[in-house]
């Protein structure tokens, strides 16, 4: 019978941490963003990749992920000291990372990456992309991942050979669908206003985001190095896009940039064979 992924939160819920994990043949460590933890209110009742995972053996995940985490947050000692210390505290079967998505979404929301077409072809998605800013963002995310991955190799680490799994998100449809808490808009949308601000044609919105995301995610794909124990799970193209005018849960997406339970189940299905290949079943 499949076992649910038992998720523990050392920072959010330290009082719920067990005295030991001897009852779990498989112990995972996770850090990331809302694709691993919809944690605005400090709990994990909402779907995520982590709680969509099922295993053949009892499995626990120590999760340091928070909604809104950027790769910069994850790399900052002020935020990730607990996560970093886990490498020296106990041996894990795998480390799961979810980062880079919020770096991109925040940059778009703040007016970076996109630009008016100007004199360029207004029907070409590339005309609306500031490649200099996009390259700078890729470099920033790359440096942050290098910092995070370096903790695994510190002299005090018990996990120098522990496999690490990263992922590549998917292509969100720009649409008027904010994230909601208790049914009320809480934050977002992120993409649609940014595209409207540069007068990008509606018909090109998804193509522009796909082009930006594909380029941006190359910096994560570049870390794929199975010989070094680093594996990138290619999740792009897994989810069915929402309709461009949908204001709420639609297809595989609960809002503009977050999958729903069905979407996360599809993403978890992409993780399972990769986990099995490294002995986590």
Model-derived features with residue positions:
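Serine-esterase "nucleophile elbow" of acetyl-processing enzymes
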Residues: 2-67
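Short amphipathic alpha-helices and their capping/turn segments at secondary-structure boundaries
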Residues: 14-20, 75-95, 147-161, 222
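Short catalytic/ligand-binding loop motif for oxyanion handling, primarily in non-cytosolic enzymes
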Residues: 37-39, 71-72, 103-107, 172-178, ...
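Oxyanion-hole/transition-state-stabilizing segment in secreted/luminal serine hydrolases
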Residues: 80-136, 170-179
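Surface-exposed cleft-lining segments at the edges of enzyme active sites
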Residues: 120-146, 200-209
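Hydrophobic, aromatic-enriched interface-forming segments
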Residues: 137-193
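Substrate-gating cap/lid alpha-helix
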Residues: 175-232, 264
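Histidine-centered active-site loop/cap adjacent to the catalytic His
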Residues: 249-281
């Amino acid at each position: 019978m499949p076992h649910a992924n038992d998720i523990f939160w050392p920072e959010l819920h330290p009082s719920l941490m067990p005295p030991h994990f001897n009852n779990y043949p498989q112990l995972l460590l996770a850090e990331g963003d809302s694709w691993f933890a919809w944690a605005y209110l400090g709990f994990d009742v909402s779907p995520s990749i982590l709680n969509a995972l099922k295993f053949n053996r009892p499995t626990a995940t120590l999760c340091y992920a928070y909604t809104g985490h950027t790769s910069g947050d994850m790399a900052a000692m002020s935020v990730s000291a607990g996560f970093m210390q886990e490498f020296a505290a106990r041996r894990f079967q795998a480390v799961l990372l979810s980062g880079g998505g919020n770096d991109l979404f925040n940059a778009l929301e703040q007016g970076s990456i996109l630009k008016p077409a100007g004199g360029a072809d207004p029907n070409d998605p590339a005309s609306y992309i500031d490649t200099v800013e996009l390259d700078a963002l890729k470099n920033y995310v790359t440096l942050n991942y290098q910092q995070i991955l370096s903790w695994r190799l510190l002299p005090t680490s018990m996990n120098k050979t522990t496999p690490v799994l990263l992922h590549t998100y998917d292509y969100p449809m720009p649409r008027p669908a904010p994230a909601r808490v208790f049914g009320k808009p809480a934050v977002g949308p992120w993409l649609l206003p940014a595209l409207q601000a540069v007068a990008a044609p509606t018909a090109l919105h998804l193509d522009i985001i796909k082009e930006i995301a594909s380029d941006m995610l190359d910096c994560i794909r570049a870390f794929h190095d199975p010989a070094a124990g680093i594996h990138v799970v290619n999740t792009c193209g897994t989810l069915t896009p929402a309709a461009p005018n949908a204001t709420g849960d639609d297809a595989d997406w609960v809002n503009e940039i977050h999958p729903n339970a069905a979407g996360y189940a599809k993403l978890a299905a992409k993780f399972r064979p990769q986990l099995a290949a490294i002995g986590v079943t």
